[in-house]
Amino acid sequence: MSPAIALAFLPLVVTLLVRYRHHFRLLVRTVLLRSFRDCLSGLRIEERAFSYVITHALPGDPGHILTTLDHWSSCCEYLSHMGPIKGQILMRLVEEKAPACVLELGTHCGYSTLLIARALPPGSRLLTVERDSRTAAVAEKVIRLAGFDEQMVELIAGSSEEVIPRLRAQHQLNRADLVLLAHRPRYYLRDLQLLEAHALLPHGATVLADHVLFPGAPRFLQYTKSCGRYRCRLHHTSLPDFPAIKDGIAQLTYTGPG
């Protein structure tokens, strides 16, 4: 490319960098720096986060563990977790619905799992599914460190596509009063339809889906609005530590087959 052509594109490049500067910062923190630290330490980000938690958080205090994870994500390495603002929305909805049984798809480091478990009424049960075995091992430690036993919070390592059909037979889950989709948005529609197909959603069940605006789940949103089985509401929010990057949590109420 000649210098003249390169100069012609310079204003466009500068404009894009300015407009998407927050997205560029996010890319640097979540991809470039994370990959570098993974190679340098031989540990994944979730494992490094747990090393910080185990030395700074109070065992048996889920609130303090959550605050410790927030601090580590803001000051050390960006964790790509739900964060305190979305977390308040999640806890409020769990407290309002008071579900007897909750299914979470996408445990990650256990952050949202602790939020749900804190807000559940006595006697309720939470099943959380994490595809990656190393991440699941970290989340298991976080959950137990917070003081939640296996009777209340059961972690299942495996892909949601394989786990959902086995929930009734292998994990005695006959119905999920509340479901949190917090794994990869491209799988939201597939997994929602699996839950429908296996009759795991009772009438009035609540389905919450994170990251429906960023990175986005357009096919999932289109389906839930057009299939006639859900009442839909969107809670507008943003990414933790990146208030300029807008996101949202979809709240669905299952009304039965259309």
From Swiss-Prot:
State one molecular function term (GO): catechol O-methyltransferase activity
Name the residues that bind S-adenosyl-L-methionine. Answer: E104, G106, T107, S112, E130, S160
Summary of the function given for this chain in its UniProt record:
Catalyzes the O-methylation, and thereby the inactivation, of catecholamine neurotransmitters and catechol hormones. Required for auditory function. Component of the cochlear hair cell's mechanotransduction (MET) machinery. Involved in the assembly of the asymmetric tip-link MET complex. Required for transportation of TMC1 and TMC2 proteins into the mechanically sensitive stereocilia of the hair cells. The function in MET is independent of the enzymatic activity.
PANTHER family of this UniProt entry? CATECHOL O-METHYLTRANSFERASE 1-RELATED (PTHR43836), TRANSMEMBRANE O-METHYLTRANSFERASE (PTHR43836:SF1)
Provide the assembly information.
Answer: Interacts with LHFPL5, PCDH15, TMC1, TMC2 and TMIE. Interacts directly with TMC1. The interaction of TOMT with TMC1 and TMC2 is required for the transportation of TMC1/2 into the stereocilia of hair cells.
Which family is this protein grouped under? Belongs to the class I-like SAM-binding methyltransferase superfamily. Cation-dependent O-methyltransferase family.
Which CDD domains does this entry report, sorted A to Z?
AdoMet_MTases
Q: Which reaction does it catalyse?
A: a catechol + S-adenosyl-L-methionine = a guaiacol + S-adenosyl-L-homocysteine + H(+)
> Which Gene Ontology terms describe the biological processes this protein takes part in?
auditory receptor cell development; catecholamine catabolic process; developmental process; dopamine metabolic process; methylation; positive regulation of protein import; sensory perception of sound
The record's section on Pfam families has: Methyltransf_3 (PF01596)
Q: What is its main location?
A: cytoplasm
EC number of this enzyme: 2.1.1.6
Question: Which UniProt key words apply to this protein?
Answer: Catecholamine metabolism, Cytoplasm, Deafness, Endoplasmic reticulum, Hearing, Methyltransferase, Neurotransmitter degradation, S-adenosyl-L-methionine, Transferase
The organism's superkingdom is given as Eukaryota
Cellular compartments annotated: Cytoplasm; Endoplasmic reticulum
Task: Fetch the Gene3D superfamilies from UniProt.
Answer: Vaccinia Virus protein VP39 (3.40.50.150)
Its recorded name reads Transmembrane O-methyltransferase homolog
Q: Name one cellular component (GO) term.
A: apical part of cell
**Taxonomic source organism:** Rattus norvegicus
Q: Name the InterPro entries on file.
A: SAM-dependent_MTases_sf, SAM_O-MeTrfase
